[in-house]
């Protein structure tokens, strides 16, 4: 039996993820007029562009909701964000600049916590504002059904009747005004923005063109660092971790992780840290483009990665990075709570993050321009005396190194023999500018 309802289930409770914006406001009132019993659920994700959460459920009641609840998701959001940080669950990068998967993390939290609240109220039909071309429709589908196996999905934007009657923002605005709500449609921006406490996503409209760049974006979590008239002074900041958890910024300890991340956002935001422009593959494999902000996570990530490289050995770091990229894809696909994701995440948290204790001092300048000034940790395996060029007591002698190099003759001989074979069969034809050894066949020795 299909879990997708293509028409409005009249006479039944329908939960809607309610942002208070034009789309969900019009959808809620339309459902009420058409005979459904709408319930509104609003997630407080610490969105930097929302200044009055308490007013949102009140508006939902005015528009016809039989019930409206505000769900505080901030603590869970930050907990999942730090888990992603600890496991390096970030697979989208361009030239070393990272997208921190802030929207996928937000969807994992929203999709589970709102549906859990609906289930408490006996609401087993859920709608939201995601479109059929995007990632969120699948993310919410997966997370919702994980929490409530009896859940049915109704999305007004998949209902042809709704589309025919209220297919655009102008029609929605007129509909709300005619209903007596004096709803003023906000001014159209050149792009769409979605945000939470971890970061902001700017995409669509003018940003669909790769001829448009970051300069058309007005940041909501930091400064437009590319503008000459924006003055940004260099700033030194210290970040301290204990057993993989960020605990202090500039010597100030935080018992509340939400407050710590808010302060990290303020510090990083003063410099435009963590902004990136990415081309990515959506879940359906079509490419999309987004410009992202994540000043706080970026700041914490710099310090965390510095400690990872100073504490763990090469093979552990390599496995951490490989697993992190795989986990990032699973997170992006809406599989953050799938068994394979839990396995990868908990492996990193147990065997990588638990050893990360220390403090890193960073100088922030403009955008992603920074320098690491100092690194301290009781767990460092970096010991400069082991490789010092000065005359110090050493853990190995020149004769030890001669023996080690002599043992390398075995694999060097194997490599030389393989290169000769490749040359004989025509796979290697070194040119004049090639750095390949001039390996010849047996007859040319």
From Swiss-Prot:
Reactions mediated catalytically: L-citrulline + L-aspartate + ATP = 2-(N(omega)-L-arginino)succinate + AMP + diphosphate + H(+)
Which keywords belong to this entry?
Answer: Amino-acid biosynthesis, Arginine biosynthesis, ATP-binding, Cytoplasm, Ligase, Nucleotide-binding
GO BP terms: namely: argininosuccinate metabolic process; L-arginine biosynthetic process; urea cycle
Instruction: List the Gene Ontology MF annotations in alphabetical order.
Output: argininosuccinate synthase activity; ATP binding; protein homodimerization activity
Cell compartment(s), UniProt: Cytoplasm
Q: Which residues bind L-citrulline?
A: 99, 135, 139, 192, 201, 203, 280
GO CC annotation, single = cytoplasm
Under InterPro entries, the record lists: Arg_succ_synth_type2_subfam (IPR023437), Arginosuc_syn_C (IPR048268), Arginosuc_syn_N (IPR048267), Arginosuc_synth (IPR001518), Arginosuc_synth_CS (IPR018223), Arginosuc_synth_type_1_subfam (IPR023434), AS_cat/multimer_dom_body (IPR024074), AS_multimer_C_tail (IPR024073)
Can you tell me which residues bind L-aspartate?
131, 135-136
Q: What is its EC number?
A: 6.3.4.5
Q: Which SUPFAM superfamilies match?
A: Adenine nucleotide alpha hydrolases-like, Argininosuccinate synthetase, C-terminal domain
Its UniProt pathway annotation is:
Amino-acid biosynthesis; L-arginine biosynthesis; L-arginine from L-ornithine and carbamoyl phosphate: step 2/3
Q: Which residues bind ATP?
A: 17-25, 43, 129, 131, 136, 194
Q: What is its main location?
A: cytoplasm
HAMAP family found in the cross-reference section: Arg_succ_synth_type2
What family does this belong to? Belongs to the argininosuccinate synthase family. Type 2 subfamily.
Name the NCBIfam families on file. Answer: argG (TIGR00032), PRK05370.1 (NF003779)
Q: Subunit notes for this chain?
A: Homotetramer.
What is the protein's name according to its record? Answer: Argininosuccinate synthase
Native organism? Burkholderia cenocepacia (strain ATCC BAA-245 / DSM 16553 / LMG 16656 / NCTC 13227 / J2315 / CF5610)
Its gene is: argG
């Amino acid at each position: 039996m299909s879990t997708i309802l293509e028409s409005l289930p009249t006479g039944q409770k329908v939960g809607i993820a309610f942002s208070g914006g034009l789309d969900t406001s019009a959808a809620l009132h339309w459902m009420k007029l058409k005979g459904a019993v709408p319930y509104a659920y609003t997630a407080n994700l610490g969105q930097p562009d929302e200044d009055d959460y308490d007013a949102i459920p009140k508006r939902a009641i005015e528009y016809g909701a039989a019930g409206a609840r505000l769900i505080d998701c901030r603590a869970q959001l930050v907990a999942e964000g730090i888990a992603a940080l600890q496991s390096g669950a970030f697979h989208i990068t361009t030239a070393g600049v990272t997208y921190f998967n802030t929207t996928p993390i937000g969807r994992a939290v929203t999709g589970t916590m709102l549906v859990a609240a609906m289930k408490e109220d006996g609401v087993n039909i859920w709608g939201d504002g995601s479109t059929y071309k995007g990632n969120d429709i699948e993310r919410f589908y997966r997370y919702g059904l994980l929490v409530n196996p009896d859940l049915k999905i109704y999305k007004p934007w998949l209902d042809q009747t709704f589309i025919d009657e209220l297919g655009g923002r102008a029609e929605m605005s007129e509909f709300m005004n005619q209903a007596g709500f004096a709803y003023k449609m906000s001014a159209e921006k050149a792009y769409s923005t979605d945000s939470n406490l971890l970061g902001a996503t700017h995409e669509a409209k003018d940003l669909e063109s790769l001829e448009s760049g970051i300069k058309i974006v007005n940041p909501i979590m930091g400064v437009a660092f590319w503008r000459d008239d924006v003055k940004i002074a260099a700033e030194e900041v210290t970040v301290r971790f204990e057993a993989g958890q960020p605990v202090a910024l500039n010597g100030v300890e935080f018992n509340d992780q939400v407050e710590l991340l808010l302060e990290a956002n303020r510090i990083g935001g003063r410099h435009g840290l963590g902004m990136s422009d990415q081309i990515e593959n959506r879940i359906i494999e079509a490419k999309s483009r987004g410009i992202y902000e994540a000043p706080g996570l970026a700041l914490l990530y710099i310090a965390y990665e510095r400690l990872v490289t100073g504490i763990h050995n090469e093979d552990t770091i390599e496995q951490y990075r490989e697993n992190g990229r795989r986990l990032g894809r699973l997170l992006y696909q809406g599989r953050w709570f799938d068994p394979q994701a839990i396995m990868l995440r908990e492996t990193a948290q147990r065997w990588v993050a638990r050893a990360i204790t220390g403090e890193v001092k960073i100088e922030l300048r403009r955008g992603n321009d920074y320098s690491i000034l100092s690194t301290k940790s009781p767990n460092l395996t970096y010991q400069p005396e082991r490789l010092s060029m000065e005359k110090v007591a050493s853990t190995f002698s020149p004769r030890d190194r001669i023996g080690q190099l002599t043992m390398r003759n075995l694999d060097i001989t194997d490599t030389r023999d393989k290169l000769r074979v490749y040359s004989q069969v025509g796979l290697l034809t070194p040119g004049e500018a090639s750095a390949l050894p001039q390996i010849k066949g047996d007859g040319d020795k």
